[in-house]
Amino acid sequence: MGSLPEQFVFRSRLPDIAIPDHLPLHDYVFERLADRRDRACLIDGATGETLSFGDVDALSRRVAAGLSSIGVCHGSTVMLLLPNSVEFAVAFLASSRLGAVTTTANPLHTPPEIAKQVAASGATVVVTEPAFVAKVSGLAGVTVVATGGGAERCASFAGLAAADGSALPEVAIDVANDAVALPYSSGTTGLPKGVMLSHRGLVTSVAQLVDGENPNLHLREDDVVLCVLPMFHVYSLHSILLCGMRAGAAIVVMKRFDTVKMLQLVERHGVTIAPLVPPIVVEMAKSDALDRHDLSSIRMVISGAAPMGKELQDIVHAKLPNAVLGQGYGMTEAGPVLSMCMAFAKEPTPVKSGACGTVVRNAELKIVDPDTGLSLPRNQPGEICIRGKQIMKGYLNNPEATEKTIDKDGWLHTGDIGFVDDDDEIFIVDRLKELIKYKGFQVAPAELEAMLIAHAAVADAAVVPMKDDSCGEIPVAFVVARDGSGITDDEIKQYVAKQVVFYKRLHKIFFVDAIPKAPSGKILRKDLRAKLAAGIPAC
């Protein structure tokens, strides 16, 4: 990507702040430990067990010492294959203390999906629950650590936590260059890639939201934050766990989403901050249990990962009249938050329906013409680009993909089409990127297409999103069957379902004579999406 004149660059309405980006992530999170050592930090939603900030600090030191004893050191990679849990948070902070990198994975992924990420990330330790040990037990060169009651032929998380926390090795962390987190993302296109988020990057991104005299996301020490979104997703890891801990709030950790149990936890613990995604809001709004619980404690509902329509916003306002509702906008590669609703600021300002906030502090944003690369003025849609210390270092072992995403002037190209209005609010209107968003989860068409084409009965295939009221988008496939194969749509669905996690499964198959392609061979997805919009019948 070349260098072009930058005529139109947008910044936050809020002034830049001093960010202690010289600190490693764990030191930044615990920087104010002396003032909140005895305050509640993590609350286990299932048991009610509460760990104070002092408890979490000490436990993360002990687990770090335990990880060190099994070979984890500066530059090692640890995979967390866990549902939401206190152990997840502690293991992440423990790895940070050692200068190790944490890669997170959905425990519902299939063994082949997990094996690919272990190999690609170079993970040598996997921390998981006994229920998921079988998914990783056959991986060569990997030490498996089991939480809970432990498991045969595995190290025990409890054993790690019994180590001497004062015996930690001295580690020289390069905050600008050492990655601390390695989530996997499909970026704007293609197969999942490891996103290298540095200590400095995550410290900057958290500070952009919750630090300063007038934080954009005003979390208080007396707040109780609901953590129902999966921590293996960067939205939850960053905006709930790290932002919550930095602000000194208590975090109620819910292992998995269940509407009734979630409402019970909100009432029981007086939850004040509810970060959600639209599919959860839909389920909550539909639930008969909603009116049986006192949810008046909620003062803020933060929506992310997928757009929230006006109709859904109206439902939230009706059901939770005390809550301020707003949206943020993020992308894993952006560190992850690009913009946040100003209604969440300590000194809030009015926001428009459909907006996803204003650009975060200490960062620059521009809108560029996808064809010319020139920056555009207000109210003109183009590709959203972001620049700042918070963005990723790059994709692990993939300089080509990195160069396609971050240009030589440091601008990260999101693949999202949007505009900035006269009040600095950002609106997303379309996507250049090919990703399918199923309930906020990323589904890369290329991954499913490679699977389909590998089937002996499939000559060609293309995967595109279809709009869905409850899921946002669902993956559907256009398939060219080989002559005489006689393959059915159910056979194709089952073939894919055996290899992928639930949200990547194909929902519909459309048999066609040919896949529309450009002379370059690129699939013309717009043509296929147009067929869906026109109501093509399922085959």
From Swiss-Prot:
Protein species of origin: Oryza sativa subsp. japonica
Induction (free text): Induced by heat stress. Induced by wounding. Down-regulated by UV irradiation.
Gene3D superfamilies (UniProt xref): 3.30.300.30, N-terminal domain of ligase-like
SUPFAM superfamilies on file: Acetyl-CoA synthetase-like
Cofactor(s), by name: Mg(2+)
Any single GO BP term: phenylpropanoid metabolic process
Name of the featured protein: 4-coumarate--CoA ligase 5
TM region positions: none
UniProt entry keywords in alphabetical sequence: ATP-binding, Ligase, Magnesium, Nucleotide-binding, Phenylpropanoid metabolism
Residues involved in (E)-4-coumaroyl-AMP binding: 235, 239, 305, 327-328, 332, 340, 433, 437
GO molecular function: (E)-caffeate-CoA ligase activity; 4-coumarate-CoA ligase activity; ATP binding; CoA-ligase activity; trans-cinnamate-CoA ligase activity; trans-feruloyl-CoA synthase activity
